[in-house]
Swiss-Prot record:
<dbReference type="GO" id="GO:0032549">
    <property type="term" value="F:ribonucleoside binding"/>
</dbReference>
<dbReference type="Pfam" id="PF00562">
    <property type="entry name" value="RNA_pol_Rpb2_6"/>
</dbReference>
<dbReference type="GO" id="GO:0003677">
    <property type="term" value="F:DNA binding"/>
</dbReference>
<dbReference type="Pfam" id="PF04565">
    <property type="entry name" value="RNA_pol_Rpb2_3"/>
</dbReference>
<dbReference type="Pfam" id="PF10385">
    <property type="entry name" value="RNA_pol_Rpb2_45"/>
</dbReference>
<dbReference type="InterPro" id="IPR007120">
    <property type="entry name" value="DNA-dir_RNAP_su2_dom"/>
</dbReference>
<dbReference type="GO" id="GO:0003899">
    <property type="term" value="F:DNA-directed RNA polymerase activity"/>
</dbReference>
<dbReference type="InterPro" id="IPR019462">
    <property type="entry name" value="DNA-dir_RNA_pol_bsu_external_1"/>
</dbReference>
<dbReference type="InterPro" id="IPR007121">
    <property type="entry name" value="RNA_pol_bsu_CS"/>
</dbReference>
<comment type="subunit">
    <text>The RNAP catalytic core consists of 2 alpha, 1 beta, 1 beta' and 1 omega subunit. When a sigma factor is associated with the core the holoenzyme is formed, which can initiate transcription.</text>
</comment>
<dbReference type="Pfam" id="PF04560">
    <property type="entry name" value="RNA_pol_Rpb2_7"/>
</dbReference>
<dbReference type="InterPro" id="IPR007641">
    <property type="entry name" value="RNA_pol_Rpb2_7"/>
</dbReference>
<dbReference type="InterPro" id="IPR007642">
    <property type="entry name" value="RNA_pol_Rpb2_2"/>
</dbReference>
<keyword id="KW-0808">Transferase</keyword>
<comment type="function">
    <text>DNA-dependent RNA polymerase catalyzes the transcription of DNA into RNA using the four ribonucleoside triphosphates as substrates.</text>
</comment>
<protein>
    <recommendedName>
        <fullName>DNA-directed RNA polymerase subunit beta</fullName>
        <ecNumber>2.7.7.6</ecNumber>
    </recommendedName>
</protein>
<keyword id="KW-0240">DNA-directed RNA polymerase</keyword>
């Protein structure tokens, strides 16, 4: 290990950063937000509010639930339990320890509760406080989130996926004419609360309006209006306007002329001005709204209508006899011929009728007259009977039920979002705090529904992202917490009523198990709490950014239609239109777009640049789908001059509804931040995505997530510029916590001295222990490698170590290989891939996979199981890898069947034969009363043991191996402590010497006289302890020395304390499951080389299986002798339409040849001492402006940069803003290659040129998780299914290959009768036949006799279950 002391030159880490030639034209004004902040913000900031003081916590998340559940009172109101505050303990184990010990990473929730007890005077009923007790109560352990946004539950890393669900609020829609045979549109409205009962209002085919609660039996909508306290008159007045008809003697009725109510139609009678008597239009002539407005403008106020025109109109008030006040007809009744004659007989002069016409139908009036309920009471009874059928109804119960349904905040919650949505849809102005329904809401929902039926307004689009919101981790767990606390509340009330309340403390009332079990159940069994996809860093990030429409309260994949799954215009910049699974979940599981974020209401927002009067500013505004509809938004690639002014006469803009319009520059409100904001992280890693077909791009994004981390990582030559961001945010790489200087580096850890603090205080030291060969969730290997050297100066958040699938701080999922597109003897037929032996020989695509095997020694009825080397009937050869305790050594090479851990189990006593008695007498007891139950390597696994962990139960004596492992870990901790202390001491004492030199000593070590001036020579002769003994004249210096000593002692004490705590944890034994005495875990690493049958893929959805590995000398090669690595079939391109891979290959070819050119220039500089200017000129030509920071450095650094570039020139071609065909040609031209990107290729077998030029270039290929080693499988004998007695299927059940119906046809076609009989009987489910075959094989005979297959017997049994007695009659 190298370590730093002042003689090593400190150099910045920045020159390690990779430079990519970027083809992007659009300046990035906004950085990609942290890719996993969606998880961390939701849980840590919004739910737990971990880093917030009690007094400053907002009423959200955990705080809001506790506030809403407490205070809890007992039924007699004597006791009251209030919530004061909550806090979390420090977790007992850190993340790594939890993973190793199979524990959950959690922390104890401590809630301070206050119990107030009151004295109630029985006579007056007045209350006095009797006593107050305040106590901190343990409420169970709550899982904490790791820094990477995951949870550790029982030792496995899990992710809680965010859920997309319908936003609370009110929605209006119609059935698209599907329900009624006449294709009539039936409109309906639905109120969806966050929690509580659903309310539906709907039209039927006869235009009567009904309502349902929770999809129960329907009732008339007016019953609901009456239940909220409206009378018939109020209902009619609220929903209808009225108009007055006055009698004109002998002529008819005069009525107000209302042009707004007129539609285009032919008149049935003359249009007469009532004031003048003029006929304006004759019967049969056409009137239009425009003409009506013209007449109104010319002074037409009233028109004359005939007496009969009133027939069929509805009264807008009760019709009374002018003399007797007797009611002749009630409000809302229709005027009939009879009623009209009564009106003329009684000489009634004025009649008020409802305005009902083609624009406003009589639906509510008709419903009202169909409804039998006349008052509120009968309406409430009606509702009660539907919801509680069979229960006796009384008015209190009915009122209470109706109130609890929609108006009780404890049972009904629209949530703040629901209220905002409701207000905006119904144009109301109710406070956001009112999260229950109000009477205004119900009245206005019905109003809007009727307006929709009258063709005013539009229905809601439920797939619009303004109507769908995201529930992230915090909110999902908050809902579980609420369920747990509500259950706990019931038990608290019971306990309050049960015991003597005066002696009870708060902790006696609270039962935390109820809460813990709910939270535990959510994390371990919920559909949204998922085993993290940890194949590679990209799959981790994607999993954390996933949005699922499935899960509790969401859709089910069987019922989800096409519309829900489809891409919607509002997905733009919010949800990726590309990345979604193939198969039944397509469109239901999505990925968030790269730049998207989730706002406080759960709606997804996308960033845009503000445009003011045609000038594009750098101000970035995040808009949700609802807000976005109000603006005109231009594309990111709209032409802009250097001053930011939009160019061109018209700009293409998106407007509401996903439509495009051309507008003038000054009308544009926003433009996109970058074209990349449309797609997800995985899709943004595909170069030339714009040249690929969407289906293939989908496969490409999905397959990148299945790429296995390789031993040698290699970032793509042709990237998109996002690689660094993904590697950094994924948590796979190690980031520096503070600015500092690297003190020590080895393969296991990095020690950095943090700088930037006050000089006189002891520096802090950051020690980064790297992960070495750890197993991921998917058995891939997690291994970190340092990137820094001793003496490097690192800044905070610099990448100091690479993780799996990262290379120099960039994500590297595969390797760059030389690819040729040509057919080769049919070996690349149907997407097969031909590879060169070099790929295998040089481990280009070799990966390490780690399997974990566990054995538990339990306490059984017959005695404890024992882990031992002393196993009965096992040869010494089989025990060769085991130590004296019976556990395998680290480093042992094992294959299937080898013993990993020796274990014996006591077996029950059986009767002893005389021979056994004799053997026992001779050889002793031991061998007979135990059976071998050792852990063996399962079939198909071989490799090297890389780690062994031994866990012993508390109180059980540890074995040698456990003690050795523990000692090793303590030594590691001691080394960390000592190194940290050494660095601190070095700087403390050098600072102390600086302070002392030149000071006059008053007091000090014996060798130094009083009054002597201290020099560095004097100090060299003293020990470190003696330096603290000095007292000097200068009081200020003395003060500084004392401060320094205080800092030093504090740091030293903290270090020792931390060390002691960790050692105590190691030595204290482990919490093992019930009955387990000892657990041993063995990790075996297997190297998987590439072989035929392995699946490989590119980034463009081009996938294939390796068909053959060809010797290097037989592969095609270039004119300079370079052998092609991989041969792909050119026919895989045209029909798939993923042309991006061809452009990638061409640019990769340019990259290799540019690298050769740079290498040539460097060689020329070295050997011929050519001027460095030539190199600089070439670099400027290649990289353009973004190379200036390199060119300003020294010649050595430029040459060092060129040496790196000589391995391959790296390009970045951002999605939708990348290299065009011309740019690719420019690079090929600069590299001195043919612009077609094709070369002459020579056949390795014949040595002759191929007839045509071949496309060759560097292409980035991935090795996918579908390895042939894990799939290939065979069986000779094995388990059989219980009922059918046929062999099981599948590798996991050690099953057979099914010889199915079609295979039987094949044998029938060939007439292979005996083979067929064998297949259907003795090789399958003829039990007796199987036994006979076995017998004849043992005896060495060739007899074959088949019986009746078991499946036939099963069929007969099924017949019998149908009461058909079928018997098989066997004739001899």
């Amino acid at each position: 290990m190298v370590s730093l002391r002042d003689n090593i030159e400190v150099q910045p880490l920045s020159h390690n950063k990779r430079v990519r030639k970027n083809f992007g034209h659009i300046n990035l004004v906004a950085d990609i937000p942290n890719l996993i902040e969606i998880q961390k913000n939701s849980y840590e900031k919004n739910f737990l509010q971990l880093d917030t003081k009690d007094s400053e916590r907002k009423n959200k998340g955990l705080q809001s639930i506790l506030n809403s559940i407490f205070p809890i009172s007992d039924p007699s109101n004597i006791a009251n339990l209030e919530f004061v505050k909550y806090e979390f303990d420090t977790p007992k184990y850190d993340v790594e320890e939890c993973t190793q010990r199979s524990l959950s990473y959690d922390s104890a929730l401590k809630v301070t509760l206050r119990l107030s007890i009151w004295d109630i005077d029985e006579d007056t009923g007045s209350r006095e406080i009797k006593g107050i007790k305040e106590q901190q109560v343990y409420m169970g352990n709550i899982p904490l989130m790791t820094k990477n946004g995951t949870f550790i539950i029982n030792g496995t890393e899990r992710v809680v996926v965010s859920q997309m669900h319908r936003s609370p609020g009110v929605f209006f829609y119609h059935d698209e004419g599907k329900v009624h045979s006449s294709r009539k549109l039936l409109y309906s409205a639905r109120v969806i609360p966050y929690r509580g009962s659903w309310l539906d209002l709907e039209f039927d085919a006869k235009d009567i309006i009904y309502f349902r609660i929770d999809r129960k039996r329907k009732l008339y909508a007016t019953t609901l209006l009456k239940a909220i306290g409206m009378s018939t008159e109020e209902i009619i007045k609220f929903y209808y306007d009225s108009v007055n008809y006055k009698v004109v003697k002998n002529k008819g009725w005069a009525v107000k002329f209302m042009p707004s109510h007129i539609t285009a139609h032919r008149l049935t009678s003359d249009l007469i001005d009532a004031d003048t008597g003029n006929v304006l239009l004759k019967a049969g002539q056409k009137i239009t709204p425009r003409l009506a407005k013209k007449y109104a403008g010319e002074g037409l106020n009233n028109i004359l209508v005939s007496h009969e025109a009133l027939i069929g109109k509805y009264l807008s008030e009760d019709l009374k006899d002018p003399e007797s006040d007797e009611i002749l007809a009630k409000i809302g009744e229709m005027i009939t011929v009879e009623l009209l004659s009564v009106i003329s007989d009684l000489k009634i002069k004025n009649i008020s009728v409802l305005v009902i016409n083609p624009q406003s139908g009589p639906y509510i009036r008709n419903t009202l007259f169909s409804d039998k309920n006349q008052d509120r009471e009968s309406a409430l009874f009606d509702i009660f009977r539907v919801l509680r059928p069979g229960e006796p109804a009384n008015i209190e119960a009915a009122e209470s039920l109706f109130y609890n349904l929609f108006f009780d905040p404890e049972r009904y919650d629209l949530s703040e979002v629901g209220r905002i949505k409701m207000n905006s849809r119904l144009e109301l102005n109710i406070s956001d705090e009112t999260t229950v329904l109000t009477t205004d809401d119900i009245k206005n929902i019905l109003r809007v529904l009727v307006e929709l039926k009258d063709r005013k307004g539009i229905i809601d689009d439920i797939d619009h992202l303004g109507n769908r919101r995201v529930r992230s981790v915090g909110e999902l767990i908050e809902n579980q917490f609420r369920i747990g606390l509500v259950r706990m509340e019931k038990s608290v009330v019971e306990r309050m009523s049960a015991g003597d309340i005066d002696t009870v403390m708060p902790h006696d009332l609270v039962n935390s198990k109820i809460l813990v079990s709910v939270v535990k159940e959510f994390f371990s069994t919920s559909q949204l709490s998922q085993f993290m996809d940890q194949t590679n860093p990209l799959s981790e990030i994607t999993h954390k950014r996933r949005l699922s429409a499935l899960g509790p309260g969401g859709l089910s994949r069987d019922r989800a239609g096409f519309e829900v799954r489809d891409v919607h215009p509002t997905h733009y910049g919010r949800i990726c239109p590309i990345e979604t699974p193939e198969g039944q979940n397509i469109g239901l599981i999505n990925s968030m777009a790269t730049y998207a974020r989730i706002n406080k209401h759960g709606f997804i927002e996308s960033p845009y640049r503000k445009v003011k009067d045609g000038h594009v500013t750098d101000e970035v505004v995040y808009l949700s789908a609802i807000e976005e509809g109000k603006y005109k938004i231009g594309q990111a690639n709209s032409k802009v001059d250097k001053d930011g002014i939009l160019q061109g006469e018209f700009i293409n803009c998106r407007v509401e509804g996903g439509n495009f319009v051309m507008v003038e520059p000054h009308e544009v409100d926003f433009i996109d931040v970058t074209p990349m904001q449309v797609v997800s992280v995985a899709a943004s890693l595909i170069p030339f995505l714009e040249n690929d077909d969407a289906n293939r791009a989908l496969m490409g994004s999905n397959m990148q997530r299945q790429a296995v981390p390789l031993i040698k990582t290699d970032a793509p030559f042709v990237g998109t510029g996002v690689e660094g961001v993904v590697a950094k945010d994924s948590g796979a790489s190690v980031l520096a916590l503070n600015d500092g200087i690297v003190e020590q580096v080895d393969s296991n850890r990095i020690v950095i001295r943090a700088i930037g603090q006050k000089t006189e205080s002891a520096p802090s030291v950051d020690i980064y222990n790297l992960l070495k060969f750890q197993k991921s969730n998917h058995n891939t290997c997690i291994n970190q490698k340092p990137l820094v050297k001793v003496g490097h100066y690192v800044k905070k958040n610099d990448i100091i170590a690479d993780g799996p699938s990262t290379d120099n701080g960039e994500i590297a999922l595969g390797r760059n290989v030389l690819v040729a597109f040509l057919p080769w003897n049919g070996y690349n037929f149907e997407d097969s891939i031909l590879i060169s032996e070099r790929i295998v020989k040089e481990d280009v695509f070799t990966s390490v996979h780690i399997e974990e095997f566990e054995v538990i020694a339990r306490d059984t009825r017959l005695g404890p199981e024992e882990i031992t080397r002393d196993i009965p009937n096992v040869s010494e050869e089989a025990l060769r890898h085991l130590d004296e305790v019976g556990i395998i050594y680290v480093g042992a090479e094992v294959k299937a069947g080898d013993i990993l851990v020796g274990k014996v189990t006591p077996k029950s006593e059986s009767p002893i034969t005389p021979e056994e008695k004799l053997l026992r007498a001779i050889f002793g007891e031991k061998a007979f009363d135990v059976k071998d139950s050792s852990l063996h390597v399962p079939s198909g696994v071989s490799g090297t043991v890389v780690e062994v962990r031994v866990f012993s139960r508390r109180g059980v004596e540890k074995d040698q191996r456990a003690i050795a492992i523990e000692k090793q870990q303590i030594e590691k901790l001691a080394k960390d402590r000592d190194d940290e202390l050494e660095i601190i001491e070095h700087f403390v004492f050098s600072w102390l010497e600086k302070l002392l030199v030149g000071q006059v000593s008053i007091n000090g070590p014996k060798t130094v006289k009083t009054g002597q001036t201290i020099t560095s020579e004097i100090l060299k002769g003293l020990s470190k302890g003696q330096l603290w003994q000095f007292t000097v004249e200068d009081a200020n210096v003395m003060n500084e020395i004392e401060q320094l000593k205080g800092h030093y002692d504090g740091k030293k004490e903290a270090l020792n304390k931390r060390f002691a705590t960790k050692v105590e944890k190691l030595q204290s034994g482990d919490d093992l499951p019930q009955g387990a005495l000892k657990v041993v875990k063995v990790f075996i690493a297997t190297k998987h080389k590439l072989q035929p049958g392995d699946k490989m893929a590119g980034r463009h959805g081009n996938k294939g299986v390796i068909s053959r590995i060809v010797p290097e000398e037989d592969m095609p090669f270039l004119e300079d002798g370079t052998v092609v690595d991989i041969v792909l079939n050119p026919l895989g391109l045209p029909s798939r339409m993923n042309i991006g891979q061809v452009l990638e290959t061409h640019l990769g070819w340019a990259s290799v040849n540019l690298a050769k050119k740079i290498a040539g220039l460097v060689e020329e500089h070295k050997t011929k001492h050519a001027s460095i200017e030539k190199i600089k000129k070439f670099l400027i030509e290649l990289y353009g402006e973004n190379i200036n920071h390199i060119l300003e450095k020294s010649d050595e650094e430029i040459i060092s940069f060129c040496n790196e570039a000589a391995k391959g020139v790296y390009f970045a071609t951002p999605v939708f803003d990348g290299a065009k065909v011309e740019d690719v040609k420019d690079m090929l031209r600069l590299a001195g290659q043919d612009l077609s990107g094709q070369v002459k290729l020579i056949d390795g077998r014949t040595g002759e040129y191929f007839d045509r030029l071949v496309t060759v270039g560097q292409k980035y290929l991935l090795k996918l998780h579908h390895l042939v080693d894990n799939k290939i499988h065979s069986r000779s004998i094995g388990p059989y299914s219980l009922v059918t007695q046929q062999p099981l299927g599948g590798k996991s059940h050690f099953g057979g290959q099914r010889f199915g119906e079609m295979e039987c046809w094949a044998l029938q076609a060939y007439g292979a009768a005996y083979t067929l009989q064998e297949m259907l009987t003795v090789k399958s489910d003829d039990v007796n036949g199987r036994i006979k075959i076995y017998d004849s094989i043992v005896r060495g005979e060739n007899n074959f006799e088949s019986g009746i297959p078991e499946s036939f017997n099963v069929m007969i049994k099924e017949f019998r279950s149908l009461c058909l007695n079928v018997k098989l009659e066997v004739t001899s």
